[in-house]
Amino acid sequence: MGTQNGVMIVMSNPTEGNETAFTEWCETVHVPEVLTVPGVVSARRFAVAQIDLPEVEGIESPPLPAHRYLVIYELDRPGNDVMAELGNRSVSGEMSLHESLDMSTIGLSAWDPITAGT
């Protein structure tokens, strides 16, 4: 991703029966809102894919992870700064949440790049 400050990873699921509303909200509201936060320069959304390994005795295909959706946000400033601003905007209501987002399953983390010698 070519940034010196890393990425923010968000893993999520829709609430039961709300996949279409969740996808629409993510694409048209939430991701565009996050992209207005200083330090967030890009976003890519992903859906989990089943890994089917060839049949080998003693090796099974891994189970699907608990999260069905992932967003990778590229950052141009420290993740803690971006996370703090996201928190401020969520509390103030400037950043909207939607009933189709299952808040009990959210996974959120910031990742710093590994450079030689660290």
What would you call each of these model-derived segments?
Residues 1-118:
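Macromolecular interaction modules
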